[in-house]
Amino acid sequence: MSSHGNSLFLRESGQRLGRVGWLQRLQESLQQRALRTRLRLQTMTREHVLRFLRRNAFILLTVSAVVIGVSLAFALRPYQLTYRQIKYFSFPGELLMRMLQMLVLPLIVSSLVTGMASLDNKATGRMGMRAAVYYMVTTVIAVFIGILMVTIIHPGKGSKEGLHREGRIETIPTADAFMDLVRNMFPPNLVEACFKQFKTQYSTRLVTRTIVRTENGSELGTSMPPPSSMDNGTSLLENVTWALGTLQEVLSFEETVPVPGSANGINALGLVVFSVAFGLVIGGVKHKGRVLRDFFDSLNEAIMRMVGIIIWYAPVGILFLIAGKILEMEDMAVLGGQLGMYTLTVIVGLFLHAGGVLPLIYFLITHRNPFPFIGGVLQALITAMGTSSSSATLPITFRCLEEGLGVDRRITRFVLPVGATVNMDGTALYEALAAIFIAQVNNYELNLGQITTISITATAASVGAAGIPQAGLVTMVIVLTSVGLPTEDITLIIAVDWFLDRLRTMTNVLGDSIGAAVIEHLSQRELELQEAELTLPSLGKPYKPLMAQEKGASRGRGGNESAM
């Protein structure tokens, strides 16, 4: 008995000492960091300042562009510019969007093909499974945060009569929307997939139906006479009697039928599916696919060189994009009342997910400080805020992760294009939150089953968003239809969607970036084995470009991201 008591006492003492030791180590680490910062400030010279400015020129210019753009927009609002004048003013920003969108298509295809071809099937399968688990977990958490925030804050309290409606929403049946998603995964024409997506359209046709009624009002449904008897005279008499005792009624009505159609825009989902399959096949044929492998690798390098040129224009474009959007707002007063509370709820939810959940996942898996990493992708985040498209931000995200943070290119070339297409944490959070907000303004009480339906539908619908601007409004129709909420009430939140769209795009891009770092950390063993195999003399040459990493950037990331 005494030995058992002593063991319990020793175990509790050990746990207490462990907790004290952890706190002490954390305190010592913070003190050492503060001391290093103090020494760095004391020994700072003009040369150090210039080196810092050169190293962070992109980020400083981009942040300055955002501040100047917002200030310039509010300074010009009193002049009440016309729509044409605002479009002229926003023209430099439109040029940036067109430049980035020009690079999206070749970048997605070349990066996915080279990334898949550089890994064997077993390593690709494991990486794909980890990416799928990460995407699903973060999306489900985002939906849960959105539901929790809108339930706690309850921004829809009151009547919707005071809310301003704006725009029109096309109603799309849920089944047709999901079938379009699957259809777009397998485009019949790859050339057409570069500029068009399949989208179900609807037409009406006139249907005529003849209804036969008897004297007592019963419906026979057809105008055929009763069967004839053996006696011709009796048969004729019965037919005359039947005709006199019946009434034919012709009904005509219009029926809405689905027909094949299309919508302008890159079919990113179909190109991703094809590129992944094509890259796996090239990797499987080994030496026979060397020419194709080298071609797509050279194409990817050329595209990244073009990104390096365009990136210097990004601050100018972002300045005019943000300023133009603020100038387009007709009335800033729409941000008050219920809509203001709704906007605040979305911002809080996105902040909790992007500033809390995603960094926590990064820290728990990699055991590194997540905030230097987030600082490394800051330019991609600001670009996402300006363009409101995770696909258009993809070239900048590649540059930040590969050249700035030294993430393995075999990981980024697989994770980033797929993530920009299907991993939409911010969109999923927004859709779940907005659906419950619309239920609240209609005084509609949702039960647990309906909230669960919203969660599942928002998670699935976010996959089909495909990184296009304001896709959340389109997929929102699916979520509302699943629980019978009025889809026309989406017009209540359109007035602030341009702003919230930028914030959720930033969340999407951050989720993709952290996902790439997490999957790289979990795939270290496969990457090292693959590198050892590919450095053999018989296989070395074709794969060397893929294994060339930015050593300086990698060392910078290792020095900055020290464990907390």
Curated annotation (Swiss-Prot):
Chief location category: membrane
Superkingdom per UniProt: Eukaryota
Keyword Phosphoprotein: yes
Intramembrane residue windows: 371-401, 451-484
Residues annotated as transmembrane: 56-76, 99-119, 133-153, 262-285, 295-322, 344-365, 411-437, 498-519
Free-text domain note: Contains eight transmembrane regions plus two helical hairpins that dip into the membrane. These helical hairpin structures play an important role in the transport process. The first enters the membrane from the cytoplasmic side, the second one from the extracellular side. During the transport cycle, the regions involved in amino acid transport, and especially the helical hairpins, move vertically by about 15-18 Angstroms, alternating between exposure to the aqueous phase and reinsertion in the lipid bilayer. In contrast, the regions involved in trimerization do not move.
Name of the molecule in the record: Excitatory amino acid transporter 4
Organism: Canis lupus familiaris (Dog)
Organism lineage: Eukaryota, Metazoa, Chordata, Craniata, Vertebrata
Name of encoding gene: SLC1A6
